[in-house]
């Protein structure tokens, strides 16, 4: 493999996983904080808020997993390598 392609692939993989985890991490923190605040205001709605929160966190985490898959493809099954 060309050293330039190899180094660009490693850099792209690092950016893919880094940027893919940045947004969902911030979003998960905000969502969790708002859920705790909502449960504190209305304790009787705790079950509904918690269920919605867990579903939302799963959707957010899937974005990070997509970034991880792209990074693994770039590192181990690079389509740009000859």
Curated annotation (Swiss-Prot):
Listed InterPro entries: ATP_synth_csu_bac/chlpt, ATP_synth_F0_csu, ATP_synth_F0_csu_DDCD_BS, ATP_synth_F0_csu_sf, ATPase_proteolipid_c-like_dom, F/V-ATP_Csub_sf
User: What keywords are assigned to this protein?
Assistant: ATP synthesis, CF(0), Hydrogen ion transport, Ion transport, Lipid-binding, Membrane, Thylakoid, Transmembrane, Transmembrane helix, Transport
Gene Ontology, cellular component aspect: plasma membrane-derived thylakoid membrane; proton-transporting ATP synthase complex; proton-transporting two-sector ATPase complex, proton-transporting domain
Record-annotated membrane-spanning stretches: 3-23, 57-77
Classify the main location. Answer: membrane
Keyword Cytoplasm present in the record's keywords: the answer is no
Top-level lineage group: Bacteria
**Entry's localization field:** Cellular thylakoid membrane
Q: Which CDD domains match?
A: ATP-synt_Fo_c_ATPH
Under SUPFAM superfamilies, the record lists:
F1F0 ATP synthase subunit C (SSF81333)
Complexes and interactors: F-type ATPases have 2 components, F(1) - the catalytic core - and F(0) - the membrane proton channel. F(1) has five subunits: alpha(3), beta(3), gamma(1), delta(1), epsilon(1). F(0) has four main subunits: a(1), b(1), b'(1) and c(10-14). The alpha and beta chains form an alternating ring which encloses part of the gamma chain. F(1) is attached to F(0) by a central stalk formed by the gamma and epsilon chains, while a peripheral stalk is formed by the delta, b and b' chains.
Q: Which family does it belong to?
A: Belongs to the ATPase C chain family.
Name of the molecule in the record: ATP synthase subunit c
């Amino acid at each position: 493999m060309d050293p330039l392609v190899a180094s660009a692939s490693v850099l792209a993989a690092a950016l893919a996983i880094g940027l893919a985890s940045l947004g969902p991490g911030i979003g998960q923190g905000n969502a969790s904080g708002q859920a705790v605040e909502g449960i504190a205001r209305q304790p009787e709605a705790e079950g509904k808020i918690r269920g919605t929160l867990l579903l939302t966190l799963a959707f957010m985490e899937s974005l990070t997993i997509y970034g991880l898959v792209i990074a693994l493809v770039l590192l181990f099954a690079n389509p740009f390598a000859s």
